[in-house]
Amino acid sequence: MPRRRVVGQRKILPDPKFNSELLAKFINVIMQDGKKSTAEKIIYKALDTASEKKSEDHLVILEAALENVRPSVEVKSRRVGGSTYQVPCEVRPVRRNALGMRWLVEAARKRGEKSMALRLAGELLDASDNKGTAVKKREDVHRMAEANKAFAHYRW
């Protein structure tokens, strides 16, 4: 953290095909080893496949999937008097998006389909229908926060 001034957050340019900042962020999450064009191909193919199967707009499917995966609460470890408590905390909107995207990509990578585009399309469709591994991850996080609600007064 700089001491002199607060550094502003860098503005992300919207993606070229759909002109969406959310999609540009998602492309950056998928990208590995700086291969952005490969990541774009994967995402566009996945969105096309999902759009054909569900006959909805590309961005509508992505937004619905993200909405069902974004966590509203999470637990953070807090040490109090020699013991560690899992304290439930609300998740800020930027982190909410980041976690949702990360969980979607992780779930897609673990799937069994042949190409990454098909895996991602399958996970996006599952998430938009409120099922799938990424949604299960969010439910687990929410369940953990609910179970540790008694420690909410340790929040900082």
From Swiss-Prot:
Key words of the record: Ribonucleoprotein, Ribosomal protein, RNA-binding, rRNA-binding, tRNA-binding
GO terms assigned for molecular function: rRNA binding; structural constituent of ribosome; tRNA binding
Classification via SUPFAM superfamilies: Ribosomal protein S7
UniProt xrefs under InterPro entries: Ribosomal_uS7 (IPR000235), Ribosomal_uS7_bac/org-type (IPR005717), Ribosomal_uS7_CS (IPR020606), Ribosomal_uS7_dom (IPR023798), Ribosomal_uS7_dom_sf (IPR036823)
Superkingdom assignment: Bacteria
GO annotation, biological process: translation
One Gene Ontology cellular component: small ribosomal subunit
Function text: One of the primary rRNA binding proteins, it binds directly to 16S rRNA where it nucleates assembly of the head domain of the 30S subunit. Is located at the subunit interface close to the decoding center, probably blocks exit of the E-site tRNA.
Family note: Belongs to the universal ribosomal protein uS7 family.
NCBIfam families assigned: rpsG_bact
Assembly and binders: Part of the 30S ribosomal subunit. Contacts proteins S9 and S11.
Name this polypeptide is given: Small ribosomal subunit protein uS7
